[in-house]
């Protein structure tokens, strides 16, 4: 394997930019409409009183940049494509737009939200329920790994919103347990992941079963050209709220790399870091499930308290581990990219990429765990000789400079 560039490192920033320019260039401008109004407060958005109560009770005081621009066009029933960094309140943007438009006297599914992982779907369900607390909203998450019969029972009893993963949602539509007749809003969250090869066909299949007149919202942290191309098939004159790629760096997150010439040296480097730093909570990313188990065993054998989660574990175990991590009873979490999307862990101050991601776009989702909503955070990347190309690709992709880890790293945490 030595000398081989990691999978995904053939990323070509120039080609990406050319493709984006082609899609978003002036000759394509008629595909999009623009919406220039910015609302500095939630009160100014014309939202229902009980929705505002839910927003303030959830802890929002002032809308984030994406919320200032994105909530109102969605509330007006416009198709929207919105791009914003992880941790900027993207989920609350579309949840508010959905909750504002529901007819609460009609207990039928009126909004369908799709997410790539069950963890993210459950996270969205929680936010939707919390923001809609004073509206009496009925939300249900349809995700794999749970009882089909229970899903059917809840859907039969009536809900306003279904959040789910494509496989289970399509299954419920096919069984006619989820009736599409009243669905008027269709949201794709983390569209870059959803529209990647794995889910593309299922999303098309679901879309075919929905009413022809439907509002579509596409939300994502990164917006690769393929995602934009596919939205053309679904959307009608969408309002585009895009952050240029240069701006999609996570403000407040200091990013460093450590040279670890060989793979075998990473473990020593990691243990050294944990012995010298006072870390409140941290997430360590590796690229395979097997490596999660291996690294967890190695860290525990050196008396470091760590927990781990990956896709081979049953859902119940993953839920318990995530609960412990959220509550702070476990402080170090080792995981794969499964967790990199949408898990809202507020106290994370440090993210370590033990392995660099295999695709530049996943870097943003990973380091977005730290510094959410402007909290400061540190991301440290372990870089072997074989990783140098990928590190360079990431820096080009986000237009950032990732510096070598300084000796005084303890002062940054």
UniProtKB/Swiss-Prot annotation:
Transmembrane segments: none annotated. GO terms for cellular component: cytoplasmic stress granule. Its EC number is 3.6.4.13. Residues 71-241 form the Helicase ATP-binding domain. A motif (DEAD box) lies at residues 189-192. Residues 252-413 form the Helicase C-terminal domain. It comes from the Eukaryota. Gene3D superfamilies: P-loop containing nucleotide triphosphate hydrolases. Keywords: ATP-binding, Helicase, Hydrolase, Initiation factor, Nucleotide-binding, Protein biosynthesis, RNA-binding. This is Eukaryotic initiation factor 4A-10. It comes from Nicotiana tabacum. The lineage of its organism: Eukaryota, Viridiplantae, Streptophyta, Embryophyta, Tracheophyta.
């Amino acid at each position: 394997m030595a000398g081989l560039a990691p999978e995904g490192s053939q990323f070509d920033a120039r080609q990406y930019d050319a493709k984006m320019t082609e899609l978003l260039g002036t000759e394509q401008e008629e595909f999009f409409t623009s919406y220039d109004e910015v609302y500095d407060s939630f009160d100014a958005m014309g939202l229902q009183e009980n929705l505002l109560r839910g927003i303030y009770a959830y802890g929002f005081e002032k809308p984030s940049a994406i919320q200032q621009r994105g909530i109102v066009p969605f509330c007006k029933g416009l198709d929207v494509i919105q791009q914003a960094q992880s941790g900027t309140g993207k989920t609350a943007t579309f949840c508010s737009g959905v909750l504002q438009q529901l007819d609460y006297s009609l207990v039928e599914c009126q909004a369908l939200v799709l997410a790539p992982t069950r963890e993210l779907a459950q996270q969205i369900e929680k936010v939707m329920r919390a923001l809609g607390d004073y509206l009496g909203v009925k939300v249900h998450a349809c995700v794999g790994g749970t009882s089909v019969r229970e899903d059917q029972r809840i859907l039969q009893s009536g809900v306003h919103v279904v959040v789910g993963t494509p496989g289970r949602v399509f299954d419920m539509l096919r069984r006619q347990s989820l009736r599409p007749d009243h669905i008027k809003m269709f949201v794709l969250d983390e569209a870059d992941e959803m529209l990647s090869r794995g889910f593309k066909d299922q999303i098309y299949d679901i879309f075919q079963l929905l009413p022809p007149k439907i509002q579509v919202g596409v939300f994502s942290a990164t917006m690769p050209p393929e995602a934009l191309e596919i939205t053309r098939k679904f959307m009608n004159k969408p309002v585009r709220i895009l952050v240029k790629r240069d701006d999609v760096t996570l403000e407040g997150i200091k990013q460093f790399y450590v040279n670890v010439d060989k793979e075998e040296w990473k473990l020593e480097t990691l243990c050294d870091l944990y012995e010298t730093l006072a870390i409140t909570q941290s997430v360590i990313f590796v690229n395979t499930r097997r490596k999660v188990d291996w690294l967890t065993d190695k860290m525990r054998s050196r008396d470091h308290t760590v927990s781990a989660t990956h896709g081979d574990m049953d859902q119940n175990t993953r839920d318990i581990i995530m609960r412990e991590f959220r509550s702070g009873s476990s402080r170090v979490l080792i995981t794969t990219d499964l967790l990199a999307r949408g898990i809202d862990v507020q106290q994370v101050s440090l993210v370590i990429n033990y392995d660099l991601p295999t695709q530049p776009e996943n870097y943003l989702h990973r380091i977005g765990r730290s510094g959410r909503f402007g909290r400061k955070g540190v991301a440290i990347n372990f870089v072997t000789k074989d990783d140098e190309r990928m590190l360079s690709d990431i820096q080009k992709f986000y237009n950032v400079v990732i510096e070598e880890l300084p000796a005084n790293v303890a002062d940054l945490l």
